[in-house]
């Protein structure tokens, strides 16, 4: 995703950096950091749970500390996977919000002329089109993100109901 090099011309034909593209860059960088950290958390908590399970089932150590470590690591792994899926869904949704003109504008007209129209023939078939496969992938990630978001909404509603009953 290249978003920081977008330059618009103003009324006087002077190049001006679009402020919207700068915020898109910051959002994309933030999403990339969240993706990297959640992926690291998945690997770290997964390896910790495997190690603690190995020590726990070998029978050479006390059971309770490693049982607590195992449950904490598994819970951390589940939460890290949820965060990873939500951030992937957010990245896919932000990519989908890009207009088709921006995507088509990325292809240079000189490339289409050099290929002799072969590019337009290939893109006409639905199997050769890379956008159809990316749209399927985006819809899959969106449905995963929506289900995870719905699960969080249900949990928050249940928590607010239980708090209101306790007071």
From Swiss-Prot:
A motif (Phosphorylation-dependent binding motif) lies at residues 161-166. It is found in: Secreted; Host vacuole, Host pathogen-containing vacuole, Host pathogen-containing vacuole membrane. Residues 94-167 are annotated as: Sufficient for interaction with human 14-3-3 beta protein. Induction: Cotranscribed with incD, incE and incG within 2 hours after internalization by host cells. Detected at 4 hours post-infection in HeLa cells (at protein level). The keyword Membrane applies. It comes from Chlamydia trachomatis serovar L2 (strain ATCC VR-902B / DSM 19102 / 434/Bu). Phosphorylated, possibly at more than one position, in infected HeLa cells. Phosphorylated by chlamydial kinase Pnk1. In infected HeLa cells colocalizes with host 14-3-3 protein (YWHAB); phosphorylation of Ser-166 is probably required. Interacts with Pkn1. It is a multi-pass membrane protein. Residues 97-167 are annotated as: Disordered. Inclusion membrane protein probably involved in early modification events of the chlamydial inclusion. Disulfide bonds: none annotated. The chain crosses the membrane at residues 33-57, 63-88. Its main location: secreted. The record marks 166 as: Interacts with 14-3-3 beta. This is Inclusion membrane protein G. Residues 122-135 have a biased composition (Low complexity). GO terms for cellular component: extracellular region; host cell membrane; pathogen-containing vacuole membrane. The modification Phosphoserine is found at residue 166.
